[in-house]
């Protein structure tokens, strides 16, 4: 009898060990900064390096790959296929997203950009490979705290016009959410940050920059002696900017003429071409870039130090969580804009179009849940997901994985806004919010 009990106990230990292996995590980054010779204009500058950063996590049975890039890459299906074949990470367990910097290359968010799409795709595959090769025993933890840097940017002004400007009473998610992977010496292997705020500070300025996400990541990596890789992802930021974005202090003028807010609403189109700065304007341009540089440093440093604060005081760590992943594609009725010549503050008219497809994914690391959406979702959609999902440790990652067919994904309440985001969206009103929220909830239900 005693022998039988010992045998049963040994069997129990073996089964328990098989189902609860030590978590391992690794991280890496690959430089994708363009060369100075690739800059589009002689007056353009490179403010700092651009990276693809990756985190690999495995529980011994399954794995996930989390990637952030300081540029954009829309052809991710083939990248995921290649990386899945190389690393063994299931395709549904990838979260690849852009930091959404508007200055992440020689053409910003334009098509003719360096780094090229091919360079970015290769860097993603390489970064995940390197992250897996660096994997070591780890603990994982989740934390969040409010960080008051952002503001809703859908504003109906005193002239009864819609414009892109600070709206202090509209919804805005202030949570900075952080997932940390610690090694056995309590050094962060990787830090995954999430915050909703557009990195638009160097948009159309001729400056190549990762903007505040890059500054935040660089700070954390520097604090921990470059033993850590920090990755940034966007939350629900479709209608959110930094508080001082596009204000008078960042106008290219020879003298700041006070603290009034410029009147920005426009019916006309926006010229997205960046021109060479003239010799006469160069000093003024450099002064503006210097002001933006200081502001971006402040945003990045505030975010980076707040993330470290969260890691120290608001995070409980787990050793052996299980990893799960799932994804779905939802179809939302589409529309085609008739008048495409204006920017905002008018109704362009629409005709019905084919359905637009939006990817919704879910990755779980123990009791931590990451929901990904393949578009720029409005704040109210993100807040609704947080409110209705039956989990407290939740991160919402926007601009992830694809397909990228929708344009901005505005909330039901924002359907009447004549901002450039809403009138440019390829989605009919009243459908996307419900479909995304329900898809996320169903994925979580199916995972249990």
Describe each model-derived feature in a short phrase.
Residues 1-4:
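Positively charged n-region of N-terminal signal peptides that target proteins for export
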Residues 21-98, 105-259, 268-299, 304-448:
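Conserved beta-alpha junction segments in alpha/beta enzyme cores
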Residues 7-16:
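Bacterial N-terminal signal peptides
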């Amino acid at each position: 009898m005693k022998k039988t009990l010992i045998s049963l106990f040994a069997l129990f230990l073996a089964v328990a060990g098989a189902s609860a292996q030590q978590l391992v995590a690794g991280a890496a980054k690959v430089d994708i900064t363009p060369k100075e010779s690739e800059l589009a204009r002689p007056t353009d500058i490179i403010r700092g390096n651009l990276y693809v950063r990756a985190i690999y996590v495995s529980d011994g049975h399954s794995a996930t790959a989390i990637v952030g890039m300081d540029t954009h890459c829309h052809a991710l299906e083939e990248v995921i296929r290649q990386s899945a074949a190389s690393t063994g990470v299931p395709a549904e367990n990838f979260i690849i997203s852009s930091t959404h910097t508007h200055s992440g290359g020689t053409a910003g968010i334009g098509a003719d950009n360096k780094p090229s799409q091919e360079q970015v795709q290769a860097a993603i595959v390489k970064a995940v490979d390197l992250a897996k090769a660096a994997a070591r025993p780890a603990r994982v933890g989740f934390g969040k705290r409010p960080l008051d840097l952002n503001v809703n940017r859908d504003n109906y002004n005193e002239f009864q016009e819609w414009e892109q400007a600070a709206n202090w009473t509209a919804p805005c998610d202030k949570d900075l959410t952080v997932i940390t992977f610690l090694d056995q010496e309590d050094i962060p292997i990787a830090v995954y940050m999430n915050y909703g705020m557009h990195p638009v500070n160097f948009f159309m300025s001729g400056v190549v920059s990762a903007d505040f996400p890059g500054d935040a990541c660089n700070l954390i990596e520097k604090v921990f002696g470059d033993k850590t890789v920090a990755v940034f992802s966007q939350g629900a930021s479709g209608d959110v900017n930094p508080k001082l974005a596009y204000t008078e202090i960042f106008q290219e003028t020879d003298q700041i003429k006070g603290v009034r807010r410029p009147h920005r609403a426009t019916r006309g189109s926006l010229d997205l071409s960046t021109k060479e700065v003239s010799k006469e304007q160069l000093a003024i341009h450099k002064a503006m870039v210097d002001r933006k540089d200081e502001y971006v440093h402040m945003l990045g440093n505030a975010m980076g130090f707040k993330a470290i604060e969260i890691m120290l005081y608001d995070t409980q760590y787990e050793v052996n969580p299980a990893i799960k992943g799932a994804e779905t594609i939802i179809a939302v009725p589409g529309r085609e804009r008739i008048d495409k010549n204006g920017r905002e503050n008018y109704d362009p008219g629409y005709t019905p179009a084919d359905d637009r497809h939006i990817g919704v994914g879910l990755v779980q690391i123990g009791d931590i849940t990451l929901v990904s959406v393949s578009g720029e979702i409005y704040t109210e959609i993100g807040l609704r997901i947080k409110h209705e999902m039956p989990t407290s440790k939740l991160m919402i990652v926007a601009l992830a994985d694809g397909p990228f067919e929708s344009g901005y994904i505005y909330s039901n309440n924002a359907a009447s806004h004549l901002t450039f985001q809403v009138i440019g969206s390829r989605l009919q009103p009243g459908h996307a919010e419900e479909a995304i929220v329900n898809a996320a909830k169903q994925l979580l239900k199916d995972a249990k």
